[in-house]
Amino acid sequence: MISGLFIFNLKGDTLICKTFRHDLKKSVTEIFRVAILTNTDYRHPIVSIGSSTYIYTKHEDLYVVAITKGNPNVMIVLEFLESLIQDLTHYFGKLNENTVKDNVSFIFELLDEMIDYGIIQTTEPDALARSVSITAVKKKGNALSLKRSHSSQLAHTTSSEIPGSVPWRRAGIKYRKNSIYIDIVERMNLLISSTGNVLRSDVSGVVKMRAMLSGMPECQFGLNDKLDFKLKQSESKSKSNNSRNPSSVNGGFVILEDCQFHQCVRLPEFENEHRITFIPPDGEVELMSYRSHENINIPFRIVPIVEQLSKQKIIYRISIRADYPHKLSSSLNFRIPVPTNVVKANPRVNRGKAGYEPSENIINWKIPRFLGETELIFYAEVELSNTTNQQIWAKPPISLDFNILMFTSSGLHVQYLRVSEPSNSKYKSIKWVRYSTRAGTCEIRI
């Protein structure tokens, strides 16, 4: 149970003080300021002082703090604090000290709906929006304003809609054109050796949805037939991320880990049929998140050659080949490190632009459009000054940033997307599915 919730600014001033139970002393805010904010030893999100546990997170110029007694499930409380921050950001557009000060009444009423006697009730924005009588208006210039909902309309909405089985979607939504967008966005972390071998690779992905659909529609989309969620330990040890033909491992299975879903997703259908079925929330939402370490499609084959011909000259030769289909393209940005005592750098490339940036000791190579199944070559001669006290160059890795549209490194893809409305047999909608893979931390050793 949460005994109290507080929002402080960076100085420790109390902006919001909301108690849900009668087991807190008045000194709890002062204890947080003195014992935690001013004490560098307390830099953990969970701190126990006496019989109280302080669970807090920092956002912009705010500290959002929950205080509990006894032995609570702190992970649930931390998740609630993150949901509270997301909800307030959703309502205000931006959450900071000024927006909190201008929306105190709204925040108090919102907390009354979210927590009842210390027990978390809901964090769903649509359900909360229908149950509070004060509506926060997003920023217009530098000012925020509040509008009060009509009380009779609110009472009708609260009694008729909130107790339903779909708290994340209100009834009576109407659009002139029904449309739904599914985006699968992946970030790849990659480490490549100086010989071009993949030392480590992993993918974190999210399935995002933007729904502008009338009524109470049923949506479903199917994922890969060859979809798996875990490997046996003996199998996992025998596999390697270094494979240059990921589809040959495990018969081309897409292997996902740590899958998490929005509450609207019906999990039994996903587990049994690899089908995501749901009644969508209105607007944008993250339907699913996942990670993958196996059977990853590495989009590029990169071989770096860095040779020091003498104390005054280094030769760079980097070849990169796109291993995705020819109809796709990507944008790339290489940050190639050079020693600090560079006198002159002459990069030559067959695509894009490359230039020496002395302030960062790098050569920046930007390729706006790199077609699949093609190869690019980077070549540079770097002249160094002859200094006797120069330290040995540590050879930091090359960093790579990229973005590939209509490509997923995990291999995850949508086979079909269907939208129907039980009360309307002629229901029509526009459906889009998009994919993208972006660089996380991608490094190439030299």
Curated annotation (Swiss-Prot):
GO terms for cellular component: AP-2 adaptor complex; cell cortex of cell tip; cell division site; cytoplasmic vesicle; cytosol; mitotic spindle; mitotic spindle pole body; nucleus. One of its GO terms (biological process) is clathrin-dependent endocytosis. It is a peripheral membrane protein. The modification Phosphothreonine is found at residue 157. Keywords: Cell membrane, Coated pit, Endocytosis, Membrane, Phosphoprotein, Protein transport, Transport. One of its GO terms (molecular function) is clathrin adaptor activity. It is found in: Cell membrane; Membrane, Coated pit. Residues 177-445 form the MHD domain. SUPFAM superfamilies: Second domain of Mu2 adaptin subunit (ap50) of ap2 adaptor (SSF49447), SNARE-like (SSF64356). Pfam families: Adap_comp_sub (PF00928), Clat_adaptor_s (PF01217). PROSITE patterns: CLAT_ADAPTOR_M_1, CLAT_ADAPTOR_M_2, MHD. The keyword Phosphoprotein applies. InterPro entries: Adaptor_comp_med_subunit, AP2_Mu_C_sf, AP2_Mu_N, AP_mu_sigma_su, Clathrin_mu, Clathrin_mu_CS, Longin-like_dom_sf, MHD. Its main location: membrane. The modification Phosphoserine is found at residues 145, 151-152. Component of the adaptor complexes which link clathrin to receptors in coated vesicles. Clathrin-associated protein complexes are believed to interact with the cytoplasmic tails of membrane proteins, leading to their selection and concentration. AP50 is a subunit of the plasma membrane adaptor (Potential). Adaptor protein complex 2 (AP-2) is a heterotetramer composed of two large adaptins (alpha-type subunit apl3 and beta-type subunit apl1), a medium chain (mu-type subunit apm4) and a small adaptin (sigma-type subunit aps2). Belongs to the adaptor complexes medium subunit family. This is AP-2 complex subunit mu. It comes from Schizosaccharomyces pombe (strain 972 / ATCC 24843) (Fission yeast). The gene is apm4.
